[in-house]
């Protein structure tokens, strides 16, 4: 297995699909990375030599991925909560942020129903 950005990339998958296993790289960015490195999208990771894998590593390192991206996202959420803005308050209360209805829906965000104590 090739190791890129601290993640073991699956060998049996095509290059475009395999590098989407890295947090922060989706389908569009994966296609752009393959185009920039000159790797065909249908090439499997196991067929790549070490030089091509090094090219992939170098191209992926240009982006914020994995731990750095997770840290950045969590710090952005924490900043909103510290500011006390509307979105921060909604994060703090574990409610939807973008104007969705909460009277009857939003069970995923709110969690299981809490029984009313009499």
Curated annotation (Swiss-Prot):
GO terms for biological process: translation. SUPFAM superfamilies: S13-like H2TH domain. The keyword tRNA-binding applies. Disulfide bonds: none annotated. GO terms for molecular function: rRNA binding; structural constituent of ribosome; tRNA binding. Keywords: Ribonucleoprotein, Ribosomal protein, RNA-binding, rRNA-binding, tRNA-binding. Belongs to the universal ribosomal protein uS13 family. NCBIfam families: uS13_bact (TIGR03631). This is Small ribosomal subunit protein uS13. It comes from Colwellia psychrerythraea (strain 34H / ATCC BAA-681) (Vibrio psychroerythus).
């Amino acid at each position: 297995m090739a190791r890129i950005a601290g993640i073991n990339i699956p060998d049996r998958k095509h290059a475009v699909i395999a590098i989407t296993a890295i947090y922060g790289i989706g389908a569009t960015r994966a296609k752009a990375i393959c185009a920039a490195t000159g790797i065909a999208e249908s090439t499997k990771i196991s067929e790549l030599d070490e030089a091509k894998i090094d090219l992939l590593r170098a191209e992926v390192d240009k982006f914020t991925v994995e731990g750095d991206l997770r840290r950045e996202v969590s710090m952005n959420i924490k900043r909103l909560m510290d500011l006390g803005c509307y979105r921060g308050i909604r994060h703090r209360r574990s409610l939807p942020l973008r104007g969705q209805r909460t009277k009857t829906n939003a069970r995923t965000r709110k969690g299981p129903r809490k029984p009313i104590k009499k």
